[in-house]
Amino acid sequence: MTGVILAGGKSIRMGKNKAFIQVEGIPIIERIHNLFRELFREVIIVTNEKDLFSNFNSKIYSDLIPGKGALGGLYTGIVVSSFYYSFCVACDMPFIKRSLVQHLIQNVANEDVIVPRTKDGLQPLHAIYSKKCIGPIRKSIEEGKSKIIDIYDQVSVKIVDEKEFLCFDPGRESFINVNTPEELISLRRN
């Protein structure tokens, strides 16, 4: 399985590249990258600023279809992955739990998507995708759609409800993302 980090966002609300924001003294991208290097045989970073990530010992790719947001990044990560399955996350999630990732990996059977569902809904940027998703993602992009979950009705999906994974991440910290300076300040206070 490949670990894919989507780091192509514009970070407009944050005002600077979210991947390099430090949480507990370590840039978020580094926290994720270190975990993924331990968990996966291949790690890919998808970004529109390849030079910023040149010091990471991973494969770095620009979007194959530029300007399509997370859906375009997901498409790129799955296409270039050497493996049938890819665990894909956003670069602004500083507290991804190893045990939760391992639990999701253990849920892989024959489905094309393995996605957790919290009380806030599906978490498509902390999920596993198969190569079978490539066609539906490309079709969604061509139709002008931007939501990852728009492909879910075209592939087989296994939803992992939070009651099944709360023992691995009781505070749901894996799904915390940092989008604004206010969220970062709040995160640092807690």
Regions found by a protein language model. Name each.
Residues 1-132, 138-145, 153-172:
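Nucleotide and nucleotide-moiety/phosphate-recognizing core
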Residues 166-190:
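Glycine-rich phosphate/pyrophosphate-binding loop and the adjoining helix
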